[in-house]
């Protein structure tokens, strides 16, 4: 469990020198997130080798992806509650063991059922790491919430960029089973080492010069003065709008994440060499992961300045345009690389904007648990993006209808953010802040201010 000089102790009773450096907390969370990225973002490289070895269909293989994402997301509310209760160090230590076992077990699986089980174990571990790292960033950085949550989420998006080439090479030389085992050991160890540096903020802790920062921050983000419990959050209409939006927006990126290899093969660009001896597929995955990482702090920073809902609207109009262009030009290797990258640049920000909006509207005390509930929407989306998209392709013999489903979801959610969520969130924040004032609760930031 978390053993620190400040665990459960009011901040006022702790000498400043004994409070952990919050930037070290951020770095440790980033490293842990990078170490779990391969479980999701390198998956597409394993699909065809697994098909060949286990003699199963693409739909059956992609059920593995759904199980991983479902367990990575649907257990996060409970895991987040444990992180809030026990602390991130102990919980991420448990997560590191599960992450390692997930890929090691997958490497030894000789049936599709055992692959489902072991990849699911990895999903549980990844969920602990993801929820714990994001929750810690929310708590340590109320003054830079969008940026620092974005940086943490970016690590999950960009982590595979540095490993995709060696993983692809190892797959060719040693096969997917050996690759799973070796990288499972590496990833588990890195998460374990990172977890040793993590700790919760002391009770009542605020960043340096917090009062001065509050006074200077312009009114750009809907921010509640009330820390809502998960049950209170579930009573808010805004939660259900956020959940539906998260589901629709997660769908598009998860389709490309899971199906990029089969898509490239369908359009005959998977083996075309485009750069330094690397195929269009490997280059695309590398570029995608880099942009998928960079987009998260970028749009987090943008949302700190123009508001979360405005950032969602702009980015997902861009996403819809990028998906449409990819549909038209996917058979050209260079455009395949460039436009799949643009899709990820417009998509990956949901993992910085939605945690930030959750913290803004429902407070930071239960931020890990509350965002964990919102994050389960990714698991719902995975059912449609993994086996669902593979089934639609098998039935139609084309990816066209899958692309159009992505475009429609992006456009609907973008307009929901601007026309529905934005005014509803503003009204809800005003009401909660008035309630807090009436109850004598100190309000650090009024409605439309940044927490």
Language model region names:
Residues 41, 69-77, 161, 289-297, ...:
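Residue-level signature of mid-helix packing/kink "hotspots" within the transmembrane helices
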Residues 74-112, 303-309:
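Conserved MFS/SLC helix-loop-helix module at the cytosolic interface between two early adjacent transmembrane helices
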Residues 50, 128-141, 149, 349-362:
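Intracellular juxtamembrane helix-capping segments at the cytosolic ends
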Residues 279-357:
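C-terminal transmembrane helical hairpin of 12-TM major facilitator-type secondary transporters
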Residues 102, 113-121, 334-342:
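Paired small-residue
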Residues 43-48, 231-299, 385:
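Extracytoplasmic gate region of multi-pass secondary transporters
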Residues 50-51, 82-83, 162, 166-174, ...:
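Interfacial helix-cap and linker-helix signal at transmembrane-aqueous boundaries
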């Amino acid at each position: 469990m978390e053993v620190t000089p400040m665990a459960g102790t009011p901040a006022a009773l702790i000498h400043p020198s004994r409070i952990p450096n919050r930037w070290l907390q951020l770095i440790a969370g980033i490293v842990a997130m990078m170490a779990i990225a391969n479980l999701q973002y390198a998956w597409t490289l394993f699909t065809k080798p697994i098909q060949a070895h286990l003699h199963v269909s693409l739909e059956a293989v992609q059920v593995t992806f759904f199980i991983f994402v479902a367990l990575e997301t649907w257990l996060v509310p409970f895991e987040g509650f444990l992180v809030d209760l026990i602390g991130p160090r102990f919980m991420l230590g448990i997560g590191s063991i599960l992450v390692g076992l997930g890929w090691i077990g997958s490497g030894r699986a000789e049936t599709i059922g055992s692959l489902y089980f072991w990849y699911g174990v990895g999903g549980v571990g990844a969920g602990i790491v993801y929820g714990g790292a994001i929750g810690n960033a929310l708590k340590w950085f109320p003054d830079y919430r969008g940026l620092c949550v974005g940086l943490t989420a970016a690590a999950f998006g960009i982590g595979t960029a540095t490993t995709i080439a060696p993983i692809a090479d190892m797959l060719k030389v040693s096969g997917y089973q050996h690759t799973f085992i070796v990288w499972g050991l590496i990833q588990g160890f890195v998460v374990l080492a990172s977890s040793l540096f993590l700790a919760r903020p002391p009770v009542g802790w605020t960043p340096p010069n917090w009062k001065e920062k509050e006074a200077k921050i312009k009114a750009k983000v809907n921010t509640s003065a009330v820390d809502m419990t998960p049950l209170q959050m579930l009573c808010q209409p805004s939660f259900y709008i956020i959940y539906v939006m998260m589901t629709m927006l997660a769908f598009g990126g998860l389709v490309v994440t899971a199906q990029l290899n089969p898509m490239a093969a369908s359009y005959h660009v998977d083996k075309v060499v485009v750069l330094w001896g690397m195929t269009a597929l490997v280059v695309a995955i590398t570029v995608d992961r880099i942009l998928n990482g960079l987009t998260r702090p970028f749009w987090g920073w943008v949302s700190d300045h123009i508001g979360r809902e405005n950032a969602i609207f702009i980015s997902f109009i861009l996403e819809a345009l990028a998906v449409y262009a990819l549909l038209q030009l996917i058979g050209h290797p260079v455009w395949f690389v460039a436009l799949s990258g643009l899709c990820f640049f417009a998509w990956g920000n949901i993992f910085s904007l939605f945690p930030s909006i959750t913290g803004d509207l429902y407070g930071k005390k239960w931020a890990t648990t509350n965002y964990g509930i919102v994050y389960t929407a990714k698991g719902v989306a995975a059912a449609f993006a993994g086996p669902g998209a593979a089934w639609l392709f098998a039935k139609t013999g084309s990816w066209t209808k899958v692309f159009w489903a992505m475009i429609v979801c992006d456009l609907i959610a973008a307009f929901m953010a601007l026309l529905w969520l934005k005014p509803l969130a503003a009204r809800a924040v005003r009401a909660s802040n008035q309630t807090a004032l009436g109850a004598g609760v100190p309000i650090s930031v009024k409605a439309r201010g940044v927490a």
